[in-house]
Amino acid sequence: MNKEVIPVTEIPKFQSRAEEFFPIQWYKEMLNNSPVYFHEETNTWNVFQYEHVKQVLSNYDFFSSDGQRTTIFVGDNSKKKSTSPITNLTNLDPPDHRKARSLLAAAFTPRSLKNWEPRIKQIAADLVEAIQKNSTINIVDDLSSPFPSLVIADLFGVPVKDRYQFKKWVDILFQPYDQERLEEIEQEKQRAGAEYFQYLYPIVIEKRSNLSDDIISDLIQAEVDGETFTDEEIVHATMLLLGAGVETTSHAIANMFYSFLYDDKSLYSELRNNRELAPKAVEEMLRYRFHISRRDRTVKQDNELLGVKLKKGDVVIAWMSACNMDETMFENPFSVDIHRPTNKKHLTFGNGPHFCLGAPLARLEMKIILEAFLEAFSHIEPFEDFELEPHLTASATGQSLTYLPMTVYR
């Protein structure tokens, strides 16, 4: 299906990159004054409160993932038709979605995560060890960018030498559509998609004869009701997993350290002295400092579930990052508090049938890299002359850090 891309950046109309990076004032405004908002220019309904967002994401009888318009794409917006449930996974509703999702979930079982943990810890330890003591580093280049790429290359079972090529493909495949560069971006995505396919397809074929402990081997062996993946479907499946395995995690790690430096400077010291709190810190960072996250749904039948008259075919955008600031769910939501008991109820990874498959891996990676950093460095300090605005760039998840300097002390 060739979908129309909704120019979602036209809805908030941010005045700067920094404002888009952390639009806390806009969240407040929409939550308090326009919780259900119709945006005429994009012809979309927008919801921001926790219960509304949860309803739109989970109630597939009324809000469908399949529609002619969308806010986000994985890969390219090609006109080539595909009947593969994996290729179309993000557009499927239950029950069609369930079988494809179950096959894909074979890559993220609790057993797999437990088996992967030592490998991920070793990658984290190697990166942290390479950082010189009492030095100023760029956390993006030195840690948050290479770490997830190294991990996913290892978990896919591909040569480590290709890890940076993975990151390049991810940057292109998940870049946002720009109304002024639609055709150019489309061509870039199609080229990157073709390169990725040509690279990974032979690896999948080879692994069918040489199974090992990696995600591709798990996908080869996955079976639900007698159905298995084709080689082509496995390549497409790995492309979906790249979003959470590299793109999302890389930005989340950088944002976590930004928060330690600029939101609450006492937090790093607290975590250093109480390292068992690392999982709580990860959840609060996912709630408070994640990028703008949203999902679109198409109304399947007329309803008034959101307190307004919705017509079949209407598009509703659920703003998860805004609902994470809803004070009916999170006390004092506009402040960092790793001890808030409801933090894990955030909807950063979605809700319902399309809850992010890679969420457990993203959480595990963030926890491991934070624990490794806390073990190695006694404290961190911000770079005195750092300016945020010049060091942000547009990404699939909003504005992302390209440079974050800090001084580290062992």
Curated annotation (Swiss-Prot):
Compartments in which it is found: Cytoplasm
E.C. designation(s): 1.14.14.-
Keyword Metal-binding carried by entry: yes
Binding site for heme: C356
PROSITE patterns reported for this sequence: CYTOCHROME_P450
InterPro entries, A to Z: Cyt_P450, Cyt_P450_B, Cyt_P450_CS, Cyt_P450_sf
GO CC, alphabetical: cytoplasm
Taxonomic superkingdom: Bacteria
UniProt GO molecular function: heme binding; iron ion binding; monooxygenase activity; oxidoreductase activity, acting on paired donors, with incorporation or reduction of molecular oxygen
Cofactor section: heme
SUPFAM superfamilies: Cytochrome P450
Keywords: Cytoplasm, Heme, Iron, Metal-binding, Monooxygenase, Oxidoreductase
Function (record text): Cytochromes P450 are a group of heme-thiolate monooxygenases. They oxidize a variety of structurally unrelated compounds, including steroids, fatty acids, and xenobiotics.
Family: Belongs to the cytochrome P450 family.
Name of protein: Cytochrome P450(BM-1)
Source organism of this protein record: Priestia megaterium (strain ATCC 14581 / DSM 32 / CCUG 1817 / JCM 2506 / NBRC 15308 / NCIMB 9376 / NCTC 10342 / NRRL B-14308 / VKM B-512 / Ford 19) (Bacillus megaterium)
